[in-house]
Regions:
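Short amphipathic, basic-aromatic surface patches that mediate peripheral association
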Residues: 2-20
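Solvent-exposed serine/threonine-rich low-complexity stretches and specific carbohydrate-binding patches
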Residues: 40-49
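Short, surface-exposed loop/turn segments at beta-strand-coil junctions that are enriched for proline
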Residues: 60-66
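Extended low-complexity, serine/threonine- and proline-enriched intrinsically disordered segments
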Residues: 20-37
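Aromatic sugar-binding surface patches on proteins
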Residues: 50-58
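Short, aromatic- and glycine-rich surface loops/edge beta-strands on solvent-exposed regions
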Residues: 66-77
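Compositionally biased low-complexity segments at domain edges in trafficked proteins
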Residues: 102-118
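Short acidic/polar inter-strand loop motif in beta-rich domains
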Residues: 75-89
Length: 118
């Protein structure tokens, strides 16, 4: 299970609930094992008690549990027609957000992969 908490920060547009979930985003995770194998997953909204709303997907690691991984998360604004953006927002901010790309390297998932939530 890979997940991202994507919430408004204190630097977000006026009127945004700081810490509030940002819905309708297009979130993709690319997980690359040291052996070169990769897994691409579209993260979709999930909800649970601990994290509340978040983007996630159940995945299989593309390599061994004890390998080192690189993960790239691409966050795109909603596709056309998925979110109505009112005139006042569009005039002030243009769009919900610009594409964001986050890359994390030298990750070990071994401890997490061997745990169980239940």
């Amino acid at each position: 299970h890979i997940e991202m908490l994507i919430n408004w920060s204190d630097e977000s547009p006026a009127g945004s609930a700081v810490g509030g979930f940002i819905p309708y985003l297009d979130v993709t995770a690319t997980i690359v094992a040291k052996n070169g194998n990769l897994e691409i997953a579209k993260l979709t909204p999930h909800i649970n008690i601990i994290d509340n709303f978040h983007y996630a997907q159940n995945i299989k690691l593309p390599g061994a549990i004890d390998e080192i991984y690189k993960v790239t998360i691409i966050i795109d604004p909603p596709s056309d027609g998925e979110l109505g953006i009112h005139y006042d927002w569009k005039e002030r901010y243009g769009s919900l957000l610009d594409q964001k790309v986050f890359t994390y390297t030298n990750l070990s998932f071994e401890e997490i992969a061997l745990k169980s939530r239940r």
